[in-house]
Structures are given as C-alpha cells and as structure tokens.
C-alpha cells in the first residue's frame, strides 16, 4: 500500500460513526448490508450514514454494489488486511506475537 492510501484509510476510521459502520460491515461478512439495514441497526440517520459511507468507499475500506434496487455495502477485506499488514509488519521485531495471531485469525 502507498502511504497516501494508508493515511486516507486511517483518516476515514478516525471518525466514531465511520468506525462503527466499518466494524458492523466487517462483522456482517461478504453478505454486506443495505444502507437501510445499517441505518436501522446502528440508529444513524440515513443522510448522515450516506455521507460516511461515501467517505469509507473513497478510502477503499468499503465497496458498494447495486443489487436490483438496493445498494449493498461490504467491507473491503483485502484492503483492510493490507492496512493491518502495514501497521504490524515490524511488530515485535519479527517475532511471533499476539498481534500476528489476531491477524491470522481473520478468515475473510
């Protein structure tokens, strides 16, 4: 990952609403969620959610796909894992540590 991409992704996650939305999408898995489902489940107004989803998509952390009349949003696991890899690549000076074990447990 390029440093500019990393900074954009971290900046997107630095907002409490975007972090909450992203974590909900990660937990949902590849099925993703519609904005309506997210707005109801997270108690976020639709217009607020729309703004934050746009920011997450711009950062590369979230993808969107049209399915019939609905937009489906999903966490971009490859991007997320690349970001985690960048943040932890020099962790513990290369020795096995709990961070590496946690990253390996993600089966996305």
Task: Please state what every model-predicted region is.
Residues 53-54:
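Short, hydrophobic-biased segments on the C-terminal half of alpha helices
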Residues 65-67, 97:
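Conserved catalytic-core motifs of GNAT/GCN5-like acyltransferases
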Residues 40, 57-58:
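Alpha-helical residues within the helix-turn-helix
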Residues 1-5, 26-27, 77-108:
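Amphipathic alpha-helical dimerization/coiled-coil segments
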Residues 4-48, 67-79:
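N-terminal helix-turn-helix DNA-binding core of bacterial DNA-binding proteins
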Residues 8, 58-59:
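A generic local structural motif
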């Amino acid at each position: 990952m390029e440093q500019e991409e990393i900074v954009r992704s971290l900046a997107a996650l630095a907002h409490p609403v975007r972090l909450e939305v992203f974590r909900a999408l990660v937990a949902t898995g590849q099925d993703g969620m519609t904005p309506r489902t997210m707005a109801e489940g997270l108690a976020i107004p639709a217009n607020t959610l729309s703004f934050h989803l746009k920011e997450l998509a711009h950062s590369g952390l979230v993808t969107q796909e049209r399915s019939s009349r609905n937009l489906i949003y999903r966490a971009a696991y490859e991007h997320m894992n690349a970001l985690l890899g960048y943040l932890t690549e020099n962790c513990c000076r290369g020795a096995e540590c709990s961070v590496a074990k946690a990253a390996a447990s993600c089966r996305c």
